[in-house]
């Protein structure tokens, strides 16, 4: 890389080439509740000031809306160090993960001290709208069966004053099935879910900032053939590469599903092979972990470019429980399966790859295609994949 000299203009107008100046960071301040009208025009003063690790945090009218430690750990520009453009980019990227903030602006001002050029750094942050509600209504038509669905969602972007995002959602759906003899034979579903997304979690031995997400989910489905309830809980780590923000990684540290079928009609039982009924329509646990990688080069600023997306996922379930069952000498049932609290648990490995591409024909038309490949293999405590992890052909995108 060729670095051109710094051109200095003298008072008489002449220009000379000199070495680039090195700037050291002097003072660093983080301003919350930044508003150009009140802070610049009216010269409003902060309500509270906190100093932590040599950095001044100036709180505004909303008080200590975000904990000082969270703001401090989001900043990579430190007093006494040389100015570095990379640390500025890292700071922008880190503050962008704080959903409690709307805008971030980093400013520098020159300060000459003992013949050394220094910079004062001010990080200006504006708060986002912390709470929001959403309502969705939709109509459905599945093979001539009409129905509707509705959901209500709530989100809080600063639950524990650390920019944690709390989300909750309830959903209901109803579908009138063709040929039903009474309203009670139609399909309906109810579900509720809640999750907390933490802005970052520094993972040992890695330099990426992980976001941690914990979630719980409950859903119940009623059909003429059966009634099924599913309780789920998960602990995930999510991160994006700083060098490639279009790539996303999700590591499912722990994913737990409990499937309960309190009712199955006799006619439905008679229509299924015994093995399918035994392994797919019985109560069971699914306890496992997995990893998902996704990439999408879509750019909303350039909608006329060809785009593609790739998604790869891998999941394993039941291995830890199976190992513990063998280690403790647990008894097997008549089918040769171990149980957890008297309930079967699934054991399998599963992988999926999806690829899609869109080719722009003109400003109104695109050609799109998609291909997906998936493989699942049950073993150990299972002879078939659980119904919730099985593959299907049909629906709006049927092949």
Residue ranges: model-predicted function:
Residues 64-65, 84-311:
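Gram-negative/organellar outer-membrane beta-barrel architecture
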Residues 2-35, 227-250, 363-394:
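Internal hydrophobic scaffold segments of catalytic domains
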Residues 39-50, 149, 226-238, 324-335, ...:
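Surface-exposed flexible segments
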Residues 1-141, 171, 351, 372-374:
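Periplasmic polypeptide-binding modules associated with outer-membrane biogenesis and secretion
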Residues 6-9, 31-42, 109, 175-177, ...:
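Short regulatory "switch" loops immediately downstream of catalytic or recognition motifs
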Residues 43-46, 140-143, 250-399:
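C-terminal outer-membrane beta-barrel translocator/porin domains of Gram-negative envelope proteins
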Residues 5-8, 218-223, 315-319, 374-377:
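Short, internal active-site loops enriched in acidic
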Residues 79, 103, 162, 363-365:
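Secondary-structure boundary/capping signal
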């Amino acid at each position: 890389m060729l670095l051109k000299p710094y051109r200095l203009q003298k008072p008489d107008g002449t220009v000379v080439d000199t070495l680039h100046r090195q700037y050291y960071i002097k003072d660093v301040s983080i301003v919350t509740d930044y508003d150009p009208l009140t802070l610049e025009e009216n010269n409003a003063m902060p309500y509270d000031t906190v100093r932590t690790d040599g950095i001044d945090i100036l709180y505004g009218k909303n008080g200590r809306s975000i904990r000082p430690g969270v703001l401090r750990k989001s900043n990579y520009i430190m007093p006494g160090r040389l100015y570095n453009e990379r640390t500025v980019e890292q700071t922008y990227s880190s503050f962008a993960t704080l959903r409690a903030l709307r805008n971030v602006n980093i400013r520098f001002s020159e300060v000459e001290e003992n013949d050394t050029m220094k910079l004062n750094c001010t990080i200006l942050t504006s708060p986002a709208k912390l709470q929001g509600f959403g309502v969705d209504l939709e109509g459905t038509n599945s093979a001539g069966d009409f129905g509707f669905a509705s959901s209500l969602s709530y989100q809080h972007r600063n639950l524990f004053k650390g920019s944690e995002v709390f989300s909750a959602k309830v959903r209901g759906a109803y579908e009138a099935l063709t040929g039903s003899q009474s309203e009670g034979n139609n399909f309906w579903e109810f579900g509720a879910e809640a999750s907390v997304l933490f802005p970052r979690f520094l993972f040992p031995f890695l330099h990426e900032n992980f976001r941690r997400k914990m979630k719980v989910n409950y859903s119940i489905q009623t059909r003429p053939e059966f009634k099924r309830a599913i309780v789920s809980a998960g602990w995930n780590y999510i991160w994006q590469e700083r060098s490639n923000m279009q790539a996303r990684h999700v590591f499912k540290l722990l994913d737990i599903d409990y499937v309960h079928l309190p009712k199955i009609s006799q006619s439905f039982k008679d229509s299924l092979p015994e093995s399918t009924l035994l392994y797919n329509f019985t109560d069971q646990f699914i306890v496992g972990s997995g990893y998902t990688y996704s990439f999408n080069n879509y750019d909303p600023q350039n909608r006329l470019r060809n785009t593609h997306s790739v998604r790869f996922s891998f999941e394993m379930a039941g291995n830890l429980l199976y190992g513990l069952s063998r280690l403790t000498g647990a008894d097997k049932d008549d089918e040769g399966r171990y149980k957890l609290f008297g309930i079967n648990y699934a054991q399998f490995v599963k992988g999926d790859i999806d690829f899609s591409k869109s080719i722009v024909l003109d400003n109104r038309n695109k050609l799109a295609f998609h291909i997906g490949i998936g493989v699942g293999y049950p073993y150990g405590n299972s002879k078939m994949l659980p119904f919730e992890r099985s593959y299907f052909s049909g629906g709006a995108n049927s092949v």
